[in-house]
């Protein structure tokens, strides 16, 4: 999204964790403090909010989600939903948000996008998602390689 929104200048290095600016966050590969970045996409301003996933940061998650109009649920195509996914997704669903599910890393060997899709659906059912929330949009792709597709999940692998 940040590439598409032209957050970076041509030729600017955009590798790494853009929103994880804290040394401890970069070292551990986790988000501790919520961050935001704004992009413009086809005349619409989109604020991207990165929240911590762990329940120890619950207050931070709730504070940020209360400002959101929607959410992206980013899930690894091999690992599927992680334990912290449950906590943040539950908070988002309770606030009435309808996630767009992003299954990332479908370019990796042994990825399981079909199974991960089912795992996300089952998790949302376990969290008492509404019928509307269960009718979520899903996209598949590789953030590392800079592409996403809303094609049928079997055709992108």
Regions found by a protein language model. Name each.
Residues 1-81, 88-89, 115, 119:
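P-loop NTPase switch module centered on the Walker A-proximal segment
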Residues 77-157:
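P-loop NTPase catalytic nucleotide-binding module
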């Amino acid at each position: 999204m940040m590439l598409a929104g032209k957050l970076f200048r041509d030729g600017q290095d955009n590798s790494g964790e853009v929103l994880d600016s804290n040394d401890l966050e970069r070292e551990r590969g986790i988000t501790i403090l919520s961050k935001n970045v704004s992009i413009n996409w086809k005349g619409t301003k989109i604020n991207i909010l990165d929240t911590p996933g762990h329940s120890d940061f619950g207050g931070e998650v709730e504070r940020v989600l209360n400002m959101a109009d929607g959410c992206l649920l980013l899930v690894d195509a091999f690992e599927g939903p992680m334990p912290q996914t449950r906590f943040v997704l539950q908070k988002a669903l309770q606030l009435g948000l309808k996630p767009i599910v992003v299954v990332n890393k479908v370019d990796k060997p042994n990825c399981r996008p079909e199974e991960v899709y089912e795992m996300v659906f089952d998790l949302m059912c376990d969290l008492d998602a509404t019928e509307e929330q269960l009718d979520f949009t899903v996209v598949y792709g590789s953030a590392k390689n800079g592409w996403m597709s809303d094609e049928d999940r079997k055709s992108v692998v």
